[in-house]
Amino acid sequence: MGCSHHWRGQAALATAYFLRRTELSFIVLDAEEAAGGAWRHGWNSLRLFSPATWSSIPGWMMPAVQDGYPSREHVIDYLTQYEARYQFPIERPVRVTSIERVTGALRVHSESSHWDAKAVVSATGTWSNPNIPSYPGAELFRGQQLHSADYVEPQAFSGKRVLVVGGGNSGAQILAEVSKVADATWVTPTDPLFLPDDVDGRVLFERATERWKAQMEGRVIEQPVGGLGDVVMVPPVVEARERGVLHAVRPFARFTPDGVVWADGSETAVDAVIWCTGFKPALGHLQPLGCY
């Protein structure tokens, strides 16, 4: 086999698109039951914060939507149709467990089989490796803790005292809807930064692209105020601001069995903590190669 390729979303499909245009023999290994990658696990109300044209992958543009930014279901449908359009050789569900060097090849192991390839593209992303910060007393806390990767909808927190931890877009969006049904507090390491109401995620793509080009060319560029983690003012976040709930407090010091202790020594009873604290690269399968 010329190339083995395992994936969780858009980057993998884009790579497969270009591999398909070569004479290489390749196969795509996907851990999911069906198309959609990490989008299959996003919360119900999740939407892109940029137009469809800015979230497309090579070869076929994502169809536009009439009601603002594409929903989770729209993205999954696009990825499903994209996969079918190009008839990529995909095997699923296959969870790659490790990759090792053998004579003349790289051997890709799953739980029940293996493949030998001259090259391997790891497009596993980060979704399967959520980052949860270490806090003193976390193991003693009797309430619920979950990462945004496992969050589905706000109704599960109705009437509860909830901490939403994390200052990025996921934190702002989850706070916006949980605060409608729960006593929610937003916890961030610093004051969140917000893009202007009339600016969407396109500016983040532009900043990231310019930063990458500068790095490749050895240039130093002046970055605008803010960064790639600035909160995009999508309608639910704007509505939360209008309700007066879009304000954050600094992190607590430690957990107690029934809540948290803040830096000033005060205590708050808490029923649930939603960690919107990002992800780490899901590259543990590369450890046998010594490159991760």
Residue ranges with predicted function:
Residues 46:
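The DNA-recognition helices of helix-turn-helix-type DNA-binding domains
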Residues 43:
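Glycine-rich loop at the start of a catalytic domain that most often binds anionic cofactors/ligands
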Residues 1-8, 13-32, 36-38, 67-292:
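Flavin (primarily FAD) cofactor-binding/catalytic cores of flavoenzymes
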Residues 49-68, 215-217:
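Glycine-rich flavin
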